[in-house]
Design a protein with these regions (language model features):
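Catalytic cores of carbohydrate-active enzymes across secretory and cytosolic contexts
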Residues: 1-185
Length: 185
């Protein structure tokens, strides 16, 4: 609703260049504060949804760092997992390490016969169990694999996310539109 009002109506839906009108509000503290309030409300909504559906309590003060897409080696969910393990090791080496709190959210489905993809899902779930139970990581690092990723879950997730990992191997992603959905939210 706010973007609709600031952009002057629905024109931006068919003509994205109409979003340039938003540049006029780049330093408008009232608009920026309102956008922050909307993002916060979306994060709280998503956190309530995850608690209800998966029993997981999210740190809504953390950055929501998201990678949701079909699981495949070229989409590099494993690379993202290795980055999380690096951060985890940094915290193990220095529990007082200052870092921006981050919740890593994964959502994916694997083809039935794709054994490597299924192992990556197991790895992410194992990492989540270890990291989320570690008191050193509390309020700093959290990992959640979103079960049964689908459109209704995406409707809660996309408006709440702050970072969308788009790290597929160059030239391999045919025509994904998930990045555009995240951008518009």
């Amino acid at each position: 609703e706010l973007v609709h009002a600031l952009a002057g109506g629905d024109e931006y839906l068919l003509h994205p260049e109409a979003l340039k009108k938003l540049e006029a509000y780049a330093h408008d503290t009232a608009v920026l504060d309102r956008l922050g309030e909307i993002k916060r409300a979306n994060k709280l909504d998503f956190a309530a949804y995850v608690k209800k559906t998966q029993g997981v309590v999210l740190n809504t003060d953390a950055i929501f760092d998201v990678q949701v897409k079909r699981l495949h080696e070229y989409k590099r969910q494993l690379l993202n997992a290795m980055h999380i393990l690096y951060l985890y090791q940094q915290l193990q080496n220095d529990p007082n390490r200052a870092m921006q709190p981050r919740v890593f959210l994964f959502g994916a489905k694997a083809a039935p016969g794709y054994a490597v993809a299924k192992r990556i899902i197991r790895l992410i779930n194992s990492m989540a169990a270890e990291i989320n139970a570690d008191p050193i990581c509390r309020d700093k690092l959290q990992v959640v694999f979103l079960e049964n990723y689908r459109v209704s879950l995406a409707e809660h997730l996309m408006p709440a996310s702050e970072v969308s990992q788009q790290i597929s191997t160059a030239g391999k992603e045919a025509s994904g539109t998930g990045n555009m959905k995240f951008m518009m939210n």
